[in-house]
Amino acid sequence: MCPGRSWVWNTARMDTDINVAVLGAGRMGEILAAGMVRSGVRSAGQILVTDANPQRVEEVASRHGFVLRESNSAAVQASSVVVLAVKPKDLPALLAEIAPSVGAGHLIVSIAAGVTTAALERGLGGSAAVVRAMPNAASSVGEGITAICAGSRAQEKDLNVARELLGGVGPVISIGEAYIDAVTAVSGSGPAYFALFAEAMVDAGVTVGLPREVSAQLVAQTMRGTAALVTEGRMEPAEVRAAVTSPGGTTAMAIRELERSGVRAGVLNAVQAAFDRARDLAGGSTGSR
């Protein structure tokens, strides 16, 4: 996000106590804003959006009925909650732009990976409450999970507001900021891990003779059903594996090969690598990708 112009589509007087400014109309910004409307915690007319790309923000506003503002600062001034949904590399310029407009009554919610609440507070230079959030890609279908943590000035009421707003795309959990990089490595990147395994499963099905579309359908529903066993059936992952694995059976042979191939170690190493990268980004204060 850079300082830039956008257009006002709705000039009606709005209650700034309930307006939410979403600065950054990229994929995740759109998903979160749409989730607020879908869950009923805000109407489309209470969502103010901006983006450095005029065409993109017009498309998003038109699709959902959001309000466009002429600048980031104007959106902040007309809102009590501000969601920072830009890439980490664009955050310093955005913070510098909006800092004069941010006051003690604002709640700032940032989804920028690798940017600490302390860095956000320094960049804003004021007394606003800051909450850091880590959603994931499954939020687009209302099945995400978002972890939030409070900055030094955020109170429980601020976390409650963040939970309410972000809850439209899935469950919200509160954690200490020390855990946020681990959350990034597990759930933030997690959909990609499962997708990679599913991709390999589909290819494997084709290898043993299934038509690709049949293999893809089998894998997708098997993933959905397995997730339901864990979330709705209250089974531990190890219990699911044990329940399916008969002594000397086909699943037992398959699990043996997966273990021989180092799948478990590969997962551990992958999550560690993601965690280390998240720490590297956080070490840069405002991060970059």
Question: Can you describe what each PLM-predicted range is?
Answer:
Residues 186, 198, 284-287:
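Catalytic, metal-anchored helix/loop core of enzyme active sites in primary metabolism
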Residues 48, 54-55, 64, 72-148, ...:
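Rossmann-like NAD(P)(H) cofactor-binding subdomain of soluble oxidoreductases
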Residues 119-129, 145-182, 195-232:
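Internal alpha-helical scaffold of NAD(P)-dependent oxidoreductase catalytic cores
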Residues 47, 57, 75, 120, ...:
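Small-residue helix-packing motif on alpha-helices
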Residues 5, 9-15, 220-289:
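NAD(P)-dependent Rossmann-like dehydrogenase/reductase catalytic/cofactor-binding core
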Residues 2-70, 74, 206-207:
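NAD(P)+-binding Rossmann beta1-loop-alpha1 motif at the extreme N-terminus of oxidoreductases
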Residues 131, 180-185, 237-242:
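Short pre-catalytic strand/loop immediately N-terminal to key active-site residues, enriched for Gly-Thr
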